[in-house]
């Protein structure tokens, strides 16, 4: 570690540098874990939110996940085309659509979550349960300071 610290110089003590490196490792392993499903992290996130809040509208999903409104339509269309989410005209506002997860969507979410749990177990194998809880707490504190997060 000391040799690596010297090689990266002034980056070594920067938390953002290490967050970016950790994210890169997580993202690459996540992509490998999802191989063959046709799913990406953003799609799994949307599917999970809609599953937990049946009837939610796409604007609310976007706000919860920090996805720009302009990107939500194509992402929802992708999930609808995959037959994982159904878009239904909202009875209270005919201009709006509510979202629900289909049976295929529930099965896909179950499959993805099992793969994600295995991916996280592998990635965090060197951490105790207490360290994982601390990591989640610390990351949550950083997220709550992010004005773009909501």
Regions from the PLM with identified roles:
Residues 57, 68:
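Helix-turn-helix DNA-binding motif, specifically the short coil turn and the N-cap/start of the second
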């Amino acid at each position: 570690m000391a040799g690596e610290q010297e090689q990266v110089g002034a980056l070594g003590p920067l938390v953002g540098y290490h967050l970016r490196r950790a994210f890169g490792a997580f993202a690459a392993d996540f992509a490998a874990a999802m191989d063959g499903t046709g799913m990406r992290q953003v799609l799994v996130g949307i599917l999970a939110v809609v599953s937990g809040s049946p009837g939610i509208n796409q604007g609310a999903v976007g706000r919860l996940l920090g996805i720009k409104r302009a990107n939500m339509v194509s992402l929802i269309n992708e999930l609808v085309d995959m037959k994982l989410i159904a878009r239904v005209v909202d009875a209270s506002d005919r201009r709006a659509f509510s979202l629900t997860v289909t049976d295929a969507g529930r099965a896909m979410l179950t499959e993805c979550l099992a793969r994600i749990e295995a991916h996280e177990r592998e990635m965090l194998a060197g951490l105790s349960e207490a360290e994982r809880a601390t990591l989640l707490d610390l990351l949550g504190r950083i997220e709550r300071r992010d004005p773009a997060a909501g």
